[in-house]
Amino acid sequence: GLLDVVKGAAKNLLASALDKLKCKVTGC
């Protein structure tokens, strides 16, 4: 349902944010 879509989007945003942060810290 809609909640699943929202959860999926939030998870994707969190994952990409963590990736960017990791790139800043470790230099990818």
UniProtKB/Swiss-Prot annotation:
InterPro entries: Antimicrobial_frog_2 (IPR012521). GO terms for cellular component: extracellular region. Belongs to the frog skin active peptide (FSAP) family. Ranatuerin subfamily. Coiled coil: none annotated. Disulfide bonds join 23-28. Has antibacterial activity against the Gram positive bacterium L.lactis. This is Ranatuerin-2AVa. Keywords: Amphibian defense peptide, Antibiotic, Antimicrobial, Disulfide bond, Secreted. Its main location: secreted. The keyword Secreted applies. It comes from the Eukaryota. It holds the Pfam family Antimicrobial_2. It is found in: Secreted. One of its GO terms (biological process) is defense response to bacterium. Expressed by the skin glands.
